[in-house]
Amino acid sequence: MKTKMIVSTSMNAGEGTRTEAEDTSKGVASLADLDSQSAAAEVSESDIKPSGPRITKDFLREHCKKNKLYLTPRLNDTLYLHFKGFSCIEGLEEYTGLRCLWLECNGIRKIENLENQTELRCLFLHQNLIHTLENLEPLSKLCTLNVSNNYIKVIENISSLSDLSTLQISHNTLGNVCDMEELSHCPSISVLDLSHNRISDPALVNILEKMPDLRVLNLMGNEVIKKIPNYRKTLIVRLKQLTYLDDRPVFPKDRACAEAWAAGGLEGEQKEREMWQTRERRKIQESLDAMTAIRETALKRRQDRELSEKGIIEFPSPVAEDQSPHDEISDIEPAESDSDSETTQEQTDASPSPSEMDHNFNSASDDSDQSQPQPNESVHSSFDEEQIRQSATWGLKPKEEKNQILSIYTKPSQSDQRVLISVSGPGALVTELISEDEIESINLSDEPVLTIDDLPDLEDEENSHILPITSQSGMRPKIEVISSIDTESEAVRSLYPWPHSDAVALDQSQQLISVSTTRNSVKQQSTAFTSLAEAGDDVPKAAEKRKTVLIEELD
């Protein structure tokens, strides 16, 4: 029995060792499988190609041809690769002349492969999947960098960009002030957009103070705005070069009031604001006064032009043109008073009576006939005196000017009493009379006028061919429309009361209506009438007594 138990125990021990060996072998196999799987995964990750469109040479060539760009890569300075769905930056090695690269609205996860773009000025990478700022050292001439709407947590690797002036990094995940310490090493940045991030530490102002050229700052959408007391005034005072904060510009008035607030509190700010308001009102009033002065000068110029068109204008003296307007006014007033007194004295002394005026005018007209052989001297003297009188009347008023012109017409000149000077200018027009010797007389011939007495006496004769009498002056025939033959015979009988037949009466009525085309002289007609009178012995005596006038003068 003992031997059997020993054999069984030995057998159980052998089985246990076998199971342990099998377990260890299985564990080693499982570890080997895990290592092989991880290695295969690494290899597969390295060998997997990015999905989606890629930036290839063929694509860039077709893109340049489509957008009418240069087919030679280095000649292009701008590439528009936005809204294409690219996941990485590649294939830009030959485009060494690029100055502006648009890669917005793609699926780019990393900034890379930009070593050959040393001339790049603007890089637009907003609305992508970028997590870190890296590989920007070759872009030494970069001026504008837009990485908005990404997943950036730390601002880094931009201190090497010495020409960077605009950084737009809004809508990211910036939170801690230490993550933005890189900004203090970028003195060239003048436009900084940090809006809509997770910034809440007021110590950000200390970093912004170290940026000497910062002019435009946007912190909207951050909690730090609520944690800084008097946010706008504080930033305006501490950032000396700031000209635009958030959504509003910083005017000089705002800066002056903020500095007064920092120095004297609310009272100092109120005083400074009142001073600025009074200054602004003064400027507005000065501008209104200037506009009023311009309008008055324009109105005065218009009135002067209208007066000059009418012939009444006050000419400024040539000597006083260089003087100021106040001096001109002060000089004109005494001149007007002196001219008034002189003109009144001259009019009272030199105004002659109407008889003397007629006598002077007649004598002047007689003397002008005698002085015709010397026309040049009189013309020159009259022209000189005209200029003198015009220059004397330049500064006078319209009333004085009329009096002066009247004295010129009425008073003869002192140099030559024989010549009457007429000055052309505003005022009444004077008509000069011509001497009787120069008047040309036309003698009209006395033509005989034909009257009624010159015409011969005509007797009433019975004649069927009575011709109308024509004279030199055209006479219009009197035409009457007769309705029937009876009325025609009655009308003829009333004109010719002697007895005659109906045929003769009809012929006579037709002759009265018809117009004769023959031209017979008065003598021929008189002989015809005498022959008719001799032949008509059978005319009754009663008809001879009643004679009618056949010829009448018509107006």
From Swiss-Prot:
Gene Ontology terms describing biological process: axoneme assembly; cell migration involved in heart jogging; cilium assembly; convergent extension involved in gastrulation; determination of heart left/right asymmetry; determination of left/right symmetry; embryonic heart tube morphogenesis; gastrulation
Pfam families, sorted: LRR_9
Knockout mutant characteristics: Development of pronephric cysts followed by death during early larval stages, at approximately 8 dpf, as a result of severe edema that is likely to be a consequence of pronephric disease progression. Fishes develop pronephric cysts with an increased proliferative index, severely reduced brush border, and disorganized pronephric cilia manifesting impaired localized fluid flow consistent with ciliary dysfunction. Electron microscopy analysis reveal ultrastructural irregularities of the dynein arms and misalignments of the outer-doublet microtubules on the ciliary axonemes.
Keyword annotations: Cell projection, Cilium, Leucine-rich repeat, Repeat
Classification via InterPro entries: Cilia_flagella_integrity, Leu-rich_rpt, LRR_dom_sf
GO molecular function, one term: dynein complex binding
Tree of life domain: Eukaryota
Sequence ranges of Basic and acidic residues compositional bias: 299-312
Spans annotated as Disordered: 1-27, 299-401
Repeat positions for LRR: 74-96, 97-118, 119-140, 141-162, 163-184, 188-209
Tissue: Specifically expressed in all ciliated tissues.
Domain LRRCT: 223-261
Keyword Repeat: yes
Entry annotated with the keyword Repeat: yes
Function: Cilium-specific protein required for the stability of the ciliary architecture. Involved in regulation of microtubule-based cilia and actin-based brush border microvilli.
Stated name of the protein: Dynein axonemal assembly factor 1
Naturally occurring in which organism (per UniProt): Danio rerio (Zebrafish)
Gene assigned in the entry: dnaaf1
